[in-house]
């Protein structure tokens, strides 16, 4: 498969801002992602500059002549459509999904509703507003149960609840990060992740090789995701070829159902009892650190980190073509 144009000239892409940092709970990871992307783009002759959205005025991007933005922000106010909307108003092309798809993908409840409406498998869930409601959800969904913020990533604020007396503290932890708290049926089995790369406006998205994740005691938390060497990543996944293709198609369908573009990473559980895959969430601005999964999957497909970053940047675009809104206003 050809996922990269070897003749792409990084110097032709103009002045580029790598948006990183931000104000979400994932700021630390975003800074690591942004630093890696910045090095990669500069290695491909791109005129790239770091831009911490927590410290800079986005309006400066227009004033200082930036042509494109690589979004290396994670979580709220970076991956949820807010920055994308600002860049739409500024008329500056950006990487990844547009305003609506970004917003829906970060909101786990909304993405699960859309997937369910499309007939795509996702664990049962309940949206709760108190510890008492979380306890009621446990009775319905069964133990163990996952309690997490509806609009955060990197397993921040997530708890695995086994007993009713744990529900109140699990709810309070999740509510520290988001007033919308999601209780989700726990799926026992292997955790998989699948990167999806857009092939351009006239071609379909394509899944890269799956990664099977084996964390100590099955606990793939924030520390194990980004800073631990104890987690084991299997790529190739070791699954039968036909099963891997089917799960890749599921990730592509999840990507399409939300209207994503550019790239994303779908997180999937493979139920041990019957090998049924379940969609957990999709990340529209995935991590790009040295522990991150997208670069690992890309390498398995023959795409280097530097070439991946350059390809994503070259695909930067806008929901609304430049001049379309001003033309409508004149009409």
From Swiss-Prot:
Residue numbers binding Mg(2+) 1: 267, 281
Gene3D superfamilies, per the entry: 3.40.50.20, ATP-grasp fold, A domain, ATP-grasp fold, B domain
Ligase listed as a keyword: yes
Catalysis performed (reactions): 2 D-alanine + ATP = D-alanyl-D-alanine + ADP + phosphate + H(+)
Keywords for the protein's UniProt record, in alphabetical order: ATP-binding, Cell shape, Cell wall biogenesis/degradation, Cytoplasm, Ligase, Magnesium, Manganese, Metal-binding, Nucleotide-binding, Peptidoglycan synthesis
Cofactor binding: number and manner: Binds 2 magnesium or manganese ions per subunit.
Localization of this protein: Cytoplasm
Record-listed Mg(2+) 2 binding positions: 281, 283
Gene Ontology biological process terms from the UniProt entry: cell wall organization; peptidoglycan biosynthetic process; regulation of cell shape
Pfam families: Dala_Dala_lig_C (PF07478), Dala_Dala_lig_N (PF01820)
EC numbers for this chain: 6.3.2.4
Residues binding ATP: 138-193
Top-tier EC class: ligase
SMART domains: GARS_A (SM01209)
Cofactor or coenzyme needed: Mg(2+); Mn(2+)
Domain annotation ATP-grasp: ranges: 112-314
Annotated pathway: Cell wall biogenesis; peptidoglycan biosynthesis
A Gene Ontology term for the protein's cellular component: cytosol
InterPro entries hit by this protein: ATP-grasp, ATP_grasp_subdomain_1, D-Ala_lig_Van_CS, D_ala_D_ala, Dala_Dala_lig_C, Dala_Dala_lig_N, PreATP-grasp_dom_sf
GO MF annotation list: ATP binding; D-alanine-D-alanine ligase activity; metal ion binding
Protein family according to the UniProt entry: Belongs to the D-alanine--D-alanine ligase family.
HAMAP family to which the protein is assigned, alphabetical: Dala_Dala_lig
Role description: Cell wall formation.
Protein name: D-alanine--D-alanine ligase
Species assigned in the record: Verminephrobacter eiseniae (strain EF01-2)
Organism lineage: Bacteria, Pseudomonadati, Pseudomonadota, Betaproteobacteria, Burkholderiales
């Amino acid at each position: 498969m050809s996922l990269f144009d070897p003749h792409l000239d990084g110097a032709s892409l103009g002045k580029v801002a790598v948006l990183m940092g931000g104000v979400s709970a994932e700021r630390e990871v975003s800074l690591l992602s942004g630093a890696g992307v910045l090095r990669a783009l500069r290695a491909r002759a791109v005129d790239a500059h770091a831009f911490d959205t927590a410290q800079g005025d986005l309006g400066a991007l227009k004033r200082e002549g930036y042509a494109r933005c690589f979004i290396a922000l994670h979580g709220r106010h970076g991956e949820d459509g807010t920055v994308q909307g600002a860049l739409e108003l500024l008329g500056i092309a950006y990487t990844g999904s547009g305003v609506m798809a970004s917003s829906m993908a970060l909101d786990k409840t909304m993405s699960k509703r859309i997937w369910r409406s499309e007939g795509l498998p996702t664990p049962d869930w309940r949206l709760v507003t108190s510890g008492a409601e979380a306890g009621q959800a446990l009775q319905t969904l069964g133990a163990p149960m996952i309690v997490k913020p509806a609009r955060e990533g990197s397993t921040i604020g997530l708890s695995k609840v086994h007993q009713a007396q744990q529900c109140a503290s699990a709810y309070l932890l999740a509510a520290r990060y988001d007033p919308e708290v999601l209780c989700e049926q726990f799926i026992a089995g292997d955790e998989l992740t699948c990167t999806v790369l857009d092939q351009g406006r006239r071609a379909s998205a394509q899944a890269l090789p799956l990664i099977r994740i084996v964390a100590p005691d099955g606990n793939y938390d924030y520390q194990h995701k980004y800073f631990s060497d104890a987690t084991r990543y299997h790529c190739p996944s070791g699954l039968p070829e036909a099963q891997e293709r089917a799960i890749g198609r599921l990730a592509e369908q999840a990507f399409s159902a939300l209207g994503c573009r550019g790239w994303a990473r779908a997180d999937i559980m493979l139920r041990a009892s019957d090998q049924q895959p379940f969609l957990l969430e999709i990340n529209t601005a995935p991590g790009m650190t040295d522990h991150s999964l997208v670069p690992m999957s890309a390498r398995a497909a023959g795409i280097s980190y530097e070439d991946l970053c350059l390809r994503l940047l070259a695909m930067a675009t806008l929901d609304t073509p430049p001049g379309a809104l001003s033309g409508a206003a004149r009409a």
